[in-house]
Amino acid sequence: MTYQWREDGADADLLLDGASQEITVTDTNGTVSTQTWSYPSRTDCLSCHNPHAGYLLGLNTHQLNGDFTYPSTGRSDNQLRTLNHLGLFSPRIDESAIASYLSSVPLTDTSVPVETRVRSYLDANCAHCHRPDALATSFDTRFTTPFDEQNLIDGSVLYDLGVEDARVIVPRSIQRSILHRRVS
């Protein structure tokens, strides 16, 4: 099912069919452009929610392995530990092992290397499609894939967006880097 936010942002409405909407996007240089945002229909579900993505496009262990301040109590604790205490894992996880689990981080967390922040962002926002055997397989943005196996640097792209000799990321060439255009 697809929801579309109302103009005031107060709530979202269920769309029974697919739809598209023109949105205004301002890039990092201040350039304003119009982009079409597509809302998939119910018949489009399996194009993303498929066996290669594990059917569920949701959180991964490494996305939950970090502290979170719970607004209702003001307490902060590791989300995996909290969910374990609430009995939401079956079987329960060994809490002494949590520290050894991978942990992704927010893009804004400047206390960690930029590579970790970018890999965390790409995993959360792109890896449901950009992974082996999925629909868009020219590169792999999963957090767990070693960097040298991701095919991001000078990796080929399926859709060049009209950019001559486009690649996923081209060192020292933001103009030819499709990833920059996609996330801007």
Enumerate the language-model features and the residues they cover:
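Electron-transfer interface patches adjacent to heme c in soluble/periplasmic c-type cytochromes
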Residues: F68-V118, H128-D133, D140-S184
